[in-house]
Curated annotation (Swiss-Prot):
Pathway: Secondary metabolite biosynthesis. Coiled coil: none annotated. The lineage of its organism: Eukaryota, Fungi, Dikarya, Ascomycota, Pezizomycotina. Dimer. This is Amino acid oxidase imqH. It is an enzyme of class 1 (oxidoreductase).
Length: 478
């Protein structure tokens, strides 16, 4: 189908900004008038420099970039994106290669999965990573004992590290050298600049509070004509019109649609430890990896470009995946965040003197994780790194998620409004790594054509199936 004559994109996050950039580079949209709307003024000093939005989920120092997905389509997309991260998208320090160690608790990595073991998720991820590395054990290799895990972390082997055999349940995992992390805040600012300097996108600052629904004119009307979304309503009462509205407002998307069950919207706590320059250099020297501990449901990234060691919890969807491989059905979260909650959908720093019990509990988990890593009173040669375990958190941040039940994105036309409203949301805590390729695929889905680009394993039909609008909300009207 031809590109619409006028397009509004609501939201300048991962989905919205990548779409705007891709449209600016796609000749199919050369005649389209494209407007990108966000409430945040990214260019307060003029168009030559962009400042990240501190309330956005992507305002962060680091995001893990890896391609070991069990689903072929995601794996294909992730590998394509990773190649771009290693080129211009990750230039100037925006992407850095760093190996990842994924660990869980259970029996030998070489044994079949056993019920109730968190190591099952790790075994599955290892199998995918090993195959995609061409079965090259120099790139992906097993850590089949607690001692091997500690050696891979570069932190020495604790005196109490288990020396048990393969039939004992202990900490095990694997290391993948084909991974890294990206500085998300800097990347989004860079992409804004590329998009602005294309001179193809109009930037509009404003808070969208609703979608404008229109009916066909009398000359075009017919029985049972479906309504159309013909633009947006801003908080100052003004309206902007377009043939196509792309709603990519992250955690705010369900609220704007009036579809609270479209995504599970909730927040988690992220904490940062400021490393000294000596600690940063020492961790780099020891080839300290990215760490994903599925037993603890915690992952760590660092040292980053600001010298932080970042600690975060699995999203609920990630936790559910781990439990699924252990044979445990955890179902949906028990409590949804009320949409009228103060600060709903807005990320930001937390006042550490006024933390809720839930946040305090999470920080205690992080502290325990750090004490395990940088322990004292054992044979490990840690030197001054032990101080990391007890240092106060330099920053505690609230981060919002928009999970789908399947963890698949929602990138599709809203079925109740024809081809006038397109939804791009449901990042489920894994969308950022696809940033270099996501906008291109969204454009293909808008045009309902792959323009000959997509291969047989990632056809437009497969993406339409994978990212379709969920049936339960398909007839929700604005």
């Amino acid at each position: 189908m031809p590109a619409p004559k006028s397009i509004i994109i609501v939201g300048s996050g991962v989905f919205g900004l990548s779409t705007a950039h891709a449209m600016s580079q796609n000749n199919e949209f050369a005649s389209s008038k494209i407007t990108l709307i966000d409430s945040w003024n990214f260019e307060p000093s003029g168009p030559s420099a962009s400042a990240p939005n501190p309330s956005a989920a992507n305002f962060d120092t680091s995001r893990i970039i890896r391609s070991d997905y069990s689903h072929r389509t995601y794996a294909t997309l992730a590998r394509e994106a990773q190649q771009k991260w290693k080129a211009d998208w990750g230039a100037d320090g925006r992407y850095r290669n760093q190996s990842i160690v994924m660990i869980g608790e259970g029996h030998s990595m070489k044994q079949p999965m056993k019920a109730l073991e968190s190591i099952n998720y790790v075994k599955h991820a290892y199998a995918q990573s090993y195959e995609r590395a061409g079965r090259n054990s120099d790139i992906v290799h097993i850590l089949d004992s607690e001692s091997a895990v500690w050696e891979a972390l570069g932190l020495g082997t604790p005196d109490e590290a288990s020396k048990a055999g393969p039939n004992a349940s202990e900490l095990r995992g694997y290391r993948n050298h084909n991974c890294g992390w990206a500085e998300s805040g800097a990347t989004m600012a860079w992409l804004r600049q590329k998009t602005i300097h294309s001179d193809r996108i109009d930037i509009h600052i404003g808070q969208v509070v609703g979608l404008r629904v229109c009916s066909d004119s009398p000359s075009e009307s017919h029985v049972n004509a479906e309504p159309r979304v013909c633009g947006v309503i801003l908080d100052d009462g003004s309206q902007l019109t377009a043939d196509l509205t792309v709603l990519a407002a992250g955690a705010m998307t369900p609220r704007l649609l009036g579809s609270p069950t479209l995504c599970d919207v909730y927040s988690e706590t992220v904490a940062y430890v400021q490393l000294t320059e000596m600690e940063r250099r020492e961790l780099v020297r020891r080839e300290f990896p990215l760490i994903v501990n599925v037993a603890r449901k915690i992952f760590a990234i660092g040292p980053d470009n600001q010298g932080f060691l970042k600690l975060a919890r699995f999203s609920w969807s990630g936790y559910r995946d781990v439990q699924k491989f252990a044979g445990v059905d955890v179902g949906p979260r028990s409590q949804a965040a009320p949409q009228e909650e103060d600060g709903y959908g807005a990320c930001g720093d937390l006042d550490q003197t006024k933390l809720s019990p839930d946040v305090e509990s999470t920080l205690q988990d992080y502290r325990g994780f750090l004490r395990e890593l940088f322990r004292s009173g054992d044979g490990g040669d840690l030197g001054g790194l032990r101080n990391i375990a007890t240092r106060p958190f330099a920053q505690v941040r609230r981060c919002w998620y928009a999970d789908t039940v399947s963890t698949d994105f929602i990138v599709d036309y809203h079925p109740a409004y024809g081809k006038s409203l397109f939804i791009a949301t449901g990042g489920s805590d894994h969308a950022f790594k696809f940033l270099p390729v996501l906008g291109e695929r969204i454009c293909e889905l808008i045009l309902q054509s792959d323009n000959g680009k997509a291969g047989p394993s990632e056809s437009i039909q497969e993406l339409q199936r994978l990212w379709k609008f969920p049936g339960g909300d398909s007839h929700a009207k604005l």
